[in-house]
Swiss-Prot record:
Residues 272-578 form the UvrD-like helicase C-terminal domain. Binds 1 [4Fe-4S] cluster. This is ATP-dependent helicase/deoxyribonuclease subunit B. The keyword Ligase does not apply. One of its GO terms (molecular function) is ATP binding. Residues 1-277 form the UvrD-like helicase ATP-binding domain.
Length: 1157
């Protein structure tokens, strides 16, 4: 029984020596030689053995990790009768333990619902087993500590004890195998006449040291290779020395040998760096960690430091380096990319390397959490827990497991979208609505009178789809909910979930996806679908094994399963023979590398600026270790480990080392370089930091040529270079050669033309062909006034809404249009009620106004947008506020009616099609017509002597006024159009001709009075009346004005209309008035605008031409902006700037353009 230690720094040939020695011995003896290496190194070590002639094919050598050796020995000696628990199973059991003890926890009771808490607990429990730290050890160490630490240890102890209780006698973890291995080594025949060689470790856990001790006692010889700075081995025990852990292992092994009377052979010491082929790399590896500052005087040829603007520029720079190295004879397998934070670079590396046609293997297990199958399980359970809310239901639906597996997927997706739109619009947010008896009713157009109309065939067809999809969801989900409600034990809960997955035919779905992926060449995706099912099956099996007999409720089950699902990962296939590897620095599985790219070498990353994370903080660990706990040291005391990690990277390549860092992250936040890079630049005086440029134009032609990669990927860069050329910058011949190369290949030429056309891109539309325009809009255009206003706002917006008929998705929320409908509906209902009872607006009392408003709201509330006003307490409050506004409006209209001779003769009057008044017909080119249709809020009439006046009143939920500038540009045509229609059709409506009295906006709102002193009730009433004054434009005729406000006196302003009478009886300049002639000109001009718009629509006008009036643009609330892509920074995309002018100037222009002059 012998111990020998092989010691030396990295790259001095320790592993090679061990392999050579075994190669010599094995030919002369029947002994077995067992190599023990870290878990992640077994595959690479086996490959090295196969490649070494002296060992290839030798049956007397075996390579194990500690865990694999444990499996081998326990198979031989017994001890594998207990079930092995995976990491997923461990975390589920820990969660069950924590939930059972939740009421007793002092610190962690809230943390039990925090994501990541159980994986951190699992790490701590693993460390406790590895370092042989018991709960009693922790409790004893914490006796004299602060309350927060003792409470934390109390909670850890409770959870750990319950966890051990759940596992007791039935299950094993990885760490248990090492404990059992130590006990069984002595019984093993397999270990007779063996030599053990332990290589690749920088430190050993307590468990591993115990196993090594037992191997020393059993085997002929144990050889341990350690990375040490041999000449200064005693210094290795200093606090921040990078070889501290190796040195501690060295002395621990010697101490064990001494205690067990094991003979110790002389150490074999290796001093010369045999790996590094260049002086610069050998020098750097030699002086790293040395406190003496030594410099390298020559310019290093095989060491480079690069800065990049960002991570993408960094990876693209490295990809160019790789391409150059392959031209010099290097293979991809000779190179590796190492990073501290692989999550910052994995997707980016995959994308960039693919664009350079560089095969890459990313050495990182991906979480399964985002796989549709995992998401489906999680969302389905959440849907039940949260009473069938929209979000979890449709997260589950979008995974497609509710779909009929035999149906066409595209058709099912379209049906699911229809269902989702219905659910969103109708506010279906609970189980009761989903399971409510009877079919859901679908109507495309919503409104107060919708329910009175029969359903169309299109509506019935959509309704059938909605109910078909609804049933596909409700049936399996209801059964799952019922089964979960009946379940009491872990087994019953697992069976409920399993039956649910069977019912939705989850296996068939996954198999179909796997086959499709395989047929299309996506082999990795096919394997993922396969793994998803097998992993979930194993998770449920493990759940039943561990917690099958445990009593659970649905919340505990959901939490434990969620923990298990979070822990699932896709397994990695080993890299192919010639790929470049991207790996995490700490877990890299690399041997015999020629070139290393160490990326992301930023401050705080290398060395890592540790933040307290995990269950125990740095302070906790330091305090516990001070009380003789064997826990690992805190992060802040791991500076030596950071230096050692950097040393491993530095000493890994034999030929070249590239170090790089980004100067900013994706959000532009500045990132500084690592202290290690500053140190290296200080040691290599002639090492110049270079930059990985994103724009190659400043480089030489030879350097620019390295930016040419695959044809597909080079196109983007070529386009940007040609864009610079267009602006007058010089262009290297490299890019002209690349350009010409695309057009030598017909296939590439087609793609290139499409991409390069962006150089001349203008975000402009082409006018539609006349036939297309007529197909879209009709030979005769039936349109509303608001549609024409939209056309004048932006032709493309009109095209999107009325030509393509695009719509924004409807949501179950109260919108401005709904409030407008309520206000209009209330006024219509009250007016109809007054007419039915032969009452007049002006004769109502204040109490009657309140009652009328209340009755109107009671009638309307259930009819507004799927009963939204009755859907919640919040909506009940909004209904109350709307009632206040309607009550106030009713009161104001009552007061105004008392002082006005005008009376309503029509409310919500339809014109056009089936309306009471015919359409306003506008003749267009080619014998076409524009037929206007719509609804007028209110038409008032007044008579005096032989004169009859008509006016229009429009109810608005926000403040409005009639701006003639907006009329002129076609943005506000509504009121004058309505006035034109009623005056034109006066004979039909009232049996006589009439004059236009004006157009007025009535603002429906709850007014407030602001005052700096206390006011009487009468003064408040007057102020409220002033704030209710209608805005608009009225006829400049004293008779008409006096009829609109019979209380108006000379020298006063009206509280009802925008009029003021001077002392001489004339209207003041502050009045908003127009003569009859001016009204006629405006009416004529408005018809001219409709004719202009109609002809342009038939001509196919679809320009992206939004206006800008002061700061107002139609883009502000446009739902099609992402579709049109309007960008004011493009010369082809500019606003139509409109200017305000004086009313008299506008009227003159209207007169000229309307053709009345």
């Amino acid at each position: 029984m012998t111990l020998q230690i092989i010691a030396g720094k990295s790259g001095t040939g320790k592993t090679t020596h061990l392999m050579d020695e075994v190669g010599k011995k094995i030919k002369k003896t029947s002994k077995t030689y067992i190599f023990i290496v870290p878990d992640q190194m077994t595959f690479q070590m086996e490959t090295s053995f196969l490649n070494k002639e002296s060992l290839s094919g030798m049956l007397g050598t075996q390579i194990f990790s500690f865990s694999r050796l444990a499996w081998k020995i326990l198979q031989e000696t017994g001890g594998l009768s207990k079930t092995f628990l995976s990491q997923t199973g461990i975390e589920m059991v820990i969660r069950k333990a924590a939930l059972d003890q939740k009421d007793k926890l002092k610190i962690f009771s809230k943390a039990t619902s925090r994501k990541g808490f159980y994986s951190e607990l699992a790490k701590l429990f693993k460390e406790m087993k590895q370092e042989e730290v018991s709960v009693a050890d922790l409790e004893n160490s914490a006796i004299n500590m602060s309350k927060s630490v003792t409470n934390k240890i109390h909670d850890i102890s409770l959870i750990y004890q319950k966890y051990e209780e759940l596992l007791a006698g039935k299950f094993l973890e990885n760490e248990d195998y090492l404990r059992l291995l130590a006990d069984k080594i002595i019984e093993s025949d397999y270990l007779n006449q063996t030599e053990i060689i332990i290589d690749g470790f920088t430190s050993f856990s307590k468990q591993e040291l115990t196993v090594i001790e037992k191997l020393m006692e059993k085997c002929d010889k144990v050889t341990v290779s350690l990375t040490l700075n041999v000449p200064e081995i005693q210094k290795g025990l200093e606090e921040y020395n990078m070889f501290k852990q190796s040195t501690e292992a060295y002395f621990a092994l010697l101490e064990m040998a001494k205690l067990n009377k094991i003979s110790v052979e002389s150490d074999k010491l290796f001093l010369e760096n045999k790996r590094a082929k260049s002086d610069s790399l050998a020098f750097l590896a030699d002086v790293w960690g040395n406190n003496k500052f030594v410099t390298f005087e020559e310019k290093p040829q095989d060491l480079a430091i690069h800065q990049a603007n960002n991570r993408r520029a960094e990876i693209e720079g490295i990809a160019r380096e790789i391409r150059q190295l392959t031209l010099k004879g290097y293979r991809y397998q000779d190179m590796a990319i190492l990073t501290r934070n692989i999550s910052d670079y994995d997707v980016l590396c995959e994308t960039v390397m693919e664009s350079f046609d560089i095969p890459i293997f990313i050495d990182k297990k991906r979480a399964m959490a985002k796989h549709p199958f995992i998401e489906f399980i999680r969302s389905s359970i959440d849907a039940i827990l949260f009473n069938w809310k929209y979000e979890p239901i449709f997260q589950a639906v979008k995974t497609e497991f509710f779909f009929d597996v035999s149906e066409n997927t595209s058709i099912m997706r379209r049906k699911a979208d229809i269902l989702e739109n219905y659910v969103l619009e109708n506010g279906i947010q609970n189980k009761w609505k989903w399971e409510k008896e009877g079919d859901w009713i679908y109507r495309k157009i919503r409104g107060l009178s919708t329910n009175l109309l029969p359903q169309t065939d299109e509506e019935l067809e959509t309704q059938a789809i909605i109910n078909e999809m609804r049933n596909l969801i409700v049936e399996p989900l209801s059964i799952l909910e019922n089964n979960l409600a009946k379940a009491r034990t872990g087994t019953e809960f697992a069976m409920a979930l399993y039956h649910f997955l069977e019912q939705v035919k989850a296996v068939e779905h996954l198999e179909s996806w796997r086959q499709t992926a395989e047929e299309n060449g996506y082999l990795e995706l096919a394997r993922e679908h396969e793994q998803a099912w097998s992993s979930v099956s194993e998770l449920l099996d493990e759940f039943v094994e561990v917690l099958g007999e445990e009593s659970l409720d649905i919340n505990s089950f959901a939490e434990i399963v969620a923990t298990g699902l979070d822990a699932l990962e896709f397994s990695l296939l080993p890299p192919s023979l010639d790929q470049i590897v991207l790996s995490d620095m700490e877990n890299a599985k690399l041997l015999d590398m020629k070139v290393i790219f160490a990326i992301g070498m930023n401050d705080g990353i290398m060395p890592l600026r540790q933040k307290d994370k995990g269950i125990l903080s740095d302070q906790d660990r330091d305090s516990l270790r001070a009380e003789n706990s064997n826990l690992k040291p805190s992060a802040k005391n791991n500076i030596g480990e950071e230096d050692l990690l950097a040393y491993k990277i530095i000493s890994l390549p034999s030929d070249k080392l590239f170090l790089s860092y980004p100067a900013a992250d994706e959000e532009g936040k500045v990132l500084s370089e690592s202290n290690y890079l500053r140190k290296i630049k200080g040691q290599f005086k002639k090492l110049n930091e270079e930059v990985y440029l994103t724009d190659p134009s400043l480089l030489s032609d030879e350097e620019q040529s390295s930016y040419i990669r695959s044809k597909q990927a080079t196109l983007g860069l070529l386009t940007s270079q040609l864009q610079m050329y267009k602006r007058g910058y010089p262009l290297s011949n490299v890019w002209w050669d690349a350009y010409n190369g695309y057009f030598e290949d017909t296939k590439e030429s087609k793609v290139a033309k499409q991409v390069l056309s962006s150089l001349y891109y203008e975000n402009k539309t082409k006018a539609l062909h006349e036939t297309t325009a007529k197909n879209l809009f009709g030979e005769n255009i039936h349109a509303s006034v608001s549609r024409m206003e939209k056309f004048f706002s932006c032709e493309f917006q009109h095209f999107a809404q009325y030509g393509l008929k695009l719509e924004e998705r409807a949501h179950f929320k109260l919108q401005a249009v709904d409030m407008g409908e309520i206000f209009h509906g209330a006024m219509e209902w009250i007016s109809a009620e007054l007419k039915r009872n032969n009452q007049d607006w002006g004769n109502l009392t204040e109490e009657e106004c309140r009652q009328m408003a209340k009755l109107a709201m009671t009638f309307l509330a259930p009819k507004i947008q799927h009963e939204i006003l009755l859907s919640s307490k919040r909506m009940e409050y909004i209904q109350y506020k709307l009632l206040q506004i309607i009550t106030r409006a009713t009161t104001v209209l009552n007061e105004q009616a008392k002082s006005s001779a005008f009376r309503p003769i029509g409310l919500e009057v339809d014109f056009g099609l089936k309306g009471d008044i015919p359409s306003l017909k506008i003749p267009l080119k080619s014998e076409s017509e524009l037929l206007l249709q719509g609804r007028i809020d209110r038409i008032d009439v007044a008579e005096q002597d032989d004169r009859t006046f008509l006016r229009i009143i429009d109810y608005k939920s926000s403040s409005h006024d009639l701006a003639l500038t907006e009329v002129y540009y076609g943005l506000a045509l509504q009121m004058l159009t309505y006035l034109d229609i009623v005056v034109t059709n006066a004979q039909k409506m009232i049996g006589k001709t009439a004059e236009p009295a004006g157009v007025l906006y009535f603002h429906m709102h709850n007014q407030f009075v602001q005052a700096d002193k206390e006011l009487s009730d009468e003064a408040i009433a007057k102020e409220l009346q002033k704030s209710s004054k209608m805005k608009g434009l009225i006829l400049s005729d004293p008779v008409a004005v006096s009829l609109m406000d019979t209380s108006l006196e000379k020298g006063k302003s009206s509280n009802i209309i925008p009029a003021e009478i001077k002392q001489n009886g004339d209207l003041s300049a502050r009045s908003r008035t127009a003569t009859k002639e001016e009204f006629d000109k405006m009416r004529h001009f408005v018809r001219h605008k409709y004719q202009e718009a109609g002809n342009k629509i038939l001509d196919g006008a679809v320009s992206i031409n939004p206006y800008k009036l002061k700061e107002r643009t139609p883009c502000q609330f446009c739902g099609f902006r992402s579709f049109c892509g309007f960008d004011p920074s493009l010369t082809s995309n500019q606003y139509r700037h409109l200017t305000n002018e004086k009313a008299e100037n506008i009227l003159t222009k209207m007169d000229i353009e309307g053709g009345t002059q």
